Amino acid sequence: MNLDSALAYQSGFGNEFSSEALPGALPVGQNSPQKAPYGLYTELFSGTAFTMTRSEARRTWMYRIQPSANHPAFVKLERQLAGGPLGEVTPNRLRWNPLDLPTEPTDFIDGLVSMAANSGADKPAGISIYHYGANRSMERVFFNADGELLLVPQLGRLRIATELGVLDVAPLEIAVLPRGLKFRVELLDPQARGYVAENHGAPLRLPDLGPIGSNGLANPRDFLTPVAAYENLQQPTTLVQKFLGQLWGTELNHSPLNVVAWHGNNVPYKYDLRRFNTIGTVSFDHPDPSIFTVLTSPTSVHGLANLDFVIFPPRWMVAENTFRPPWFHRNLMNEFMGLIQGEYDAKAEGFVPGGASLHSCMSAHGPDGETCTKAINADLKPAKIDNTMAFMFETSQVLRPSRFALDCPQLQSTYDACWATLPATFDPTRR
């Protein structure tokens, strides 16, 4: 990889970006010249149908040493993704301790574990959710034909070398990789763990702000896209793809991360969650958690998300005469939560970094007994919730846990008991 410029970034969200690792590698005034500069091949990378509205269209022109078409047939791999098939649908509330870190050499692909999904990979909607754990860098290259990937590291820094450049991503940052983009995950620390949402629907975008105005939440300038960086390596390289949930591999005689220049908007990017401009009440009551939305994948129903990525970052709590934790709730949406660091303000214990929970459609949830008792009796001074970062993958379709998720020892069998300590405080003689 030509690393001289690899860790520079371009700022913005949804921009028409352009980058070249060699001067003059980008054609001027056209996309597909008869002879591309430096003897490169021209290739179009489409993330949406040609006839999408211009505001929705995602595509990038690449100028590369070898075209992607130069590969032998793919063969289904003997080792498939961990986690197995989906299990039985359950309305019960589920919570998991962190999955064990691998002890055998495990790269990012082998470390992916299926946790839940609500759609087949052949459908243009829905999501799949994975945990990952790894202790070695990938030596092969991977692409996912089934959807866009949202990576949420919880432990360990990652260097993600892609066709369009390099992203360094640490805990408290996220990365989004377009469907089909080739990449290699390298570990910058001895071990890595985190979460992945696979988006089978419309590409993620910033949510509309409505009456919030033209600024706030995740601001476009804080999203970073890499600059062009390429490998000119003539050596055996394994290329793995995920296609309809199955892993397939082929052997190349060159590195597929060989794009010297590119322009377009179908690009990878990263975002530092600490840059999120948190909105909250300065009077009373607890606003809806939609104010914490970082990115959204919409459905055809206006306002109904295929996937919302929501965070619960450090913030001040100043509401007067208010029960400040998230309220008790029954929800149309389905909520898969994770914790990157610290504690979640609705759960005093049991929900730890690297863990997860699933509350399905209309599953009652809310603060546990200890949190509730403290909040009812708290002295309502301004207080800061600090050193925390919880997040949620929220989706409008019911998530079905994998068989692994339902059978693994990390599933907390006593999760329901956290609400059993809620006291009966009703007294019809006292208002």
Swiss-Prot record:
Active site: H286
Annotated Fe cation binding sites: H329, E335, H365
Keyword Oxidoreductase annotated: yes
Reaction catalysed by this enzyme: homogentisate + O2 = 4-maleylacetoacetate + H(+)
Keyword terms: Dioxygenase, Iron, Metal-binding, Oxidoreductase, Phenylalanine catabolism, Tyrosine catabolism
EC number: 1.13.11.5
Pathway(s) per entry: Amino-acid degradation; L-phenylalanine degradation; acetoacetate and fumarate from L-phenylalanine: step 4/6
GO molecular function: homogentisate 1,2-dioxygenase activity; iron ion binding
SUPFAM superfamilies documented for this protein: RmlC-like cupins
One Gene Ontology cellular component: cytoplasm
Transmembrane parts of this sequence: none
Broadest EC class assigned to this enzyme: oxidoreductase
Biological processes, Gene Ontology terms: L-phenylalanine catabolic process; tyrosine catabolic process
Cofactor requirements of the protein: Fe cation
Pfam families: HgmA_C (PF04209), HgmA_N (PF20510)
UniProt entry tagged with the keyword Glycoprotein: no
Record-listed homogentisate binding positions: Y344, H365
Recorded superkingdom: Bacteria
Stated role: Involved in the catabolism of homogentisate (2,5-dihydroxyphenylacetate or 2,5-OH-PhAc), a central intermediate in the degradation of phenylalanine and tyrosine. Catalyzes the oxidative ring cleavage of the aromatic ring of homogentisate to yield maleylacetoacetate.
PANTHER family, alphabetized: HOMOGENTISATE 1,2-DIOXYGENASE (PTHR11056:SF0)
Family: Belongs to the homogentisate dioxygenase family.
Subunit structure: Hexamer; dimer of trimers.
Protein name per Swiss-Prot or TrEMBL: Homogentisate 1,2-dioxygenase
UniProt lineage: Bacteria, Pseudomonadati, Pseudomonadota, Gammaproteobacteria, Pseudomonadales
GN (gene name): hmgA
